Structure formats: C-alpha cells, structure tokens
C-alpha cells in the first residue's frame, strides 16, 4: 500500500529542519521573514531577529522559502518498477 503524505506538514518540516530563511505572506499583504521554528494544525512559530511570532495559519497566504526544498526522497528502484 502506498503511503499518504501531507504535503503542507512535510514542506513546513523541511523548512524547519533545514533552517531555510522564509518569507511568510499574510492575506493582508504584510510580509514576515524568518525561520520556521515549529508548527501545528493551526499555527506557525516564526523566529526573526531573535524574536518569535505565533502566526495563525488562516492568516497566511504563501510561504516563500529562500531556496527550493526537496519534498520527497528519491524512490527506490523497486518502487519505480512496480508503477
């Protein structure tokens, strides 16, 4: 059986683990820049200039990382053949 991935959680977790500088665009148009420190189903903690901000996800429009994030590890040869 194929595993189901939650892209949002995987993406945010990679940003957090790799300490990728990220711009968070809010639906109001305001921009916040910093590092993702933690997240859950409803909030994201962003650290910028030594200060933390708790941002509600419903207020976020876009995450724009400073560099690309690898979303999935390469599949094994066996998985590719069975498709």
UniProtKB/Swiss-Prot annotation:
GO MF annotations in UniProt: RNA binding
Keyword DNA repair found: no
Pfam name, any one: Hfq
InterPro entries named among the record's database cross-references: Hfq, LSM_dom_sf, Sm
Keywords: RNA-binding, Stress response
Cellular component aspect of the GO annotation: cytosol
Keyword Isomerase set for record: no
Ranges for domain Sm: 9-69
GO terms of biological process kind: regulation of DNA-templated transcription; regulation of RNA stability; regulation of translation, ncRNA-mediated
Protein function: RNA chaperone that binds small regulatory RNA (sRNAs) and mRNAs to facilitate mRNA translational regulation in response to envelope stress, environmental stress and changes in metabolite concentrations. Also binds with high specificity to tRNAs.
Subunit organization: Homohexamer.
Family listed: Belongs to the Hfq family.
Protein name (record): RNA-binding protein Hfq
Organism listed in the record: Exiguobacterium sibiricum (strain DSM 17290 / CCUG 55495 / CIP 109462 / JCM 13490 / 255-15)
């Amino acid at each position: 059986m194929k595993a189901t991935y939650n892209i949002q959680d995987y993406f945010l977790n990679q940003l957090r683990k790799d300490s990728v500088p990220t711009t968070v665009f809010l639906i109001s148009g305001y921009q916040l820049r910093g590092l993702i420190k933690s997240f859950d189903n409803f909030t994201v903690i962003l650290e910028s200039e030594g200060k933390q901000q708790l941002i509600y996800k419903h207020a976020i429009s876009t995450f724009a990382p400073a560099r690309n994030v690898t979303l999935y590890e390469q599949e094994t040869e066996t998985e590719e053949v069975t498709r």
